């Protein structure tokens, strides 16, 4: 939006040409999202608290969590508002990548909102039935996949990139559609499973978004992409602005979500953020890198799958409780220790993911 204004003003004032630089707009996206979070966050938290939109706690969970009951949730709405406003202000609104990732993020946020609203406002303990939740996730995920497949303007947009190896690419053809579907839906649910402790999911999300922003910038630059051996995707660079908005919104939310949390994001935030990461990863053709950088999300998801499978086959549980962060709590780890150690692991994994740019 402001880029359109800058394009007009540059005809009269040369200084406005600086807004063509992605790095500047990415930084402004971060700062704008942060400022909005700090301004809107406190009144939104008070509003959620005044309407008793508070978190419910599992009786069979760690006893330390009982004190969290009633903490305002659905704070993911703050994240979505800040991402949307910042992205619309600083991105090129003629870029289909920007609209694709933003609309999918909001669509998954809508699914999460309905689930949270049913549980917290209508007091329906089951929320949105699982079959309907996965149905709508599938509808939006498949819709995004078909849109990207049919609007792809070059073979590079639908290739599967194998990191650590030079020039190892697979032309996916129509298999690109199920790939995008599984990455977006899987990433959405993985982040949702991770969102069980104060700040546990949001900082890894911020770190992964920052890492993907670097891939987006390199992919959108012909010289960098050729030098690094990654596909050249002219439209991908604009995703730097979206990722910047996500980073700023995430850091702004963490200000209120850090231990002890003043607000939780709820499904409205977790489902949306996971879908956003999945969309950016498929748009810059780095699905495997997403699994590396988002290894915390993968670990949490696998722990749930193993727990369910083991219990169904043997009647025994592998972990004291799943997802695995609860296992460590029940082993006696204080919640802040679990959170910070998972954060440290996430930093390491993001660095490994970034290393794939050169280790080929």
From Swiss-Prot:
What class does this enzyme belong to in the EC scheme?
Answer: transferase
Q: Which cofactor does it need?
A: Mg(2+)
NCBIfam families noted in UniProt: mraY
Q: Which GO terms describe its biological process?
A: cell division; cell wall organization; peptidoglycan biosynthetic process; regulation of cell shape
Name the InterPro entries on file.
Glycosyl_transferase_4 (IPR000715), PNAcMuramoyl-5peptid_Trfase (IPR003524), PNAcMuramoyl-5peptid_Trfase_CS (IPR018480)
- State its role: Catalyzes the initial step of the lipid cycle reactions in the biosynthesis of the cell wall peptidoglycan: transfers peptidoglycan precursor phospho-MurNAc-pentapeptide from UDP-MurNAc-pentapeptide onto the lipid carrier undecaprenyl phosphate, yielding undecaprenyl-pyrophosphoryl-MurNAc-pentapeptide, known as lipid I.
- Belongs to which family? Belongs to the glycosyltransferase 4 family. MraY subfamily.
EC numbers for this chain:
2.7.8.13
Q: Catalysed reaction per UniProt?
A: UDP-N-acetyl-alpha-D-muramoyl-L-alanyl-gamma-D-glutamyl-meso-2,6-diaminopimeloyl-D-alanyl-D-alanine + di-trans,octa-cis-undecaprenyl phosphate = di-trans,octa-cis-undecaprenyl diphospho-N-acetyl-alpha-D-muramoyl-L-alanyl-D-glutamyl-meso-2,6-diaminopimeloyl-D-alanyl-D-alanine + UMP
Q: Note the superkingdom of the native organism.
A: Bacteria
Question: In the record, what terms sit under GO molecular function?
Answer: metal ion binding; phospho-N-acetylmuramoyl-pentapeptide-transferase activity; UDP-N-acetylmuramoyl-L-alanyl-D-glutamyl-meso-2,6-diaminopimelyl-D-alanyl-D-alanine:undecaprenyl-phosphate transferase activity
Q: From the UniProt record, report the name of the gene that encodes this protein.
A: mraY
The organism's taxonomic lineage, starting at the top: Bacteria, Pseudomonadati, Pseudomonadota, Gammaproteobacteria, Methylococcales
As for membrane topology, the entry says: Multi-pass membrane protein
What is this protein identified as? Phospho-N-acetylmuramoyl-pentapeptide-transferase
Report the pathway entry.
Cell wall biogenesis; peptidoglycan biosynthesis
Query: How is this protein annotated for GO cellular component?
Result: plasma membrane
Q: Where in the cell is it found?
A: Cell inner membrane
What keywords are annotated for this sequence in UniProt? Cell cycle, Cell division, Cell inner membrane, Cell membrane, Cell shape, Cell wall biogenesis/degradation, Magnesium, Membrane, Metal-binding, Peptidoglycan synthesis, Transferase, Transmembrane, Transmembrane helix
Q: Which PROSITE patterns match?
A: MRAY_1 (PS01347), MRAY_2 (PS01348)
- Listed transmembrane segments: 21-41, 70-90, 97-117, 134-154, 168-188, 199-219, 236-256, 263-283, 288-308, 338-358
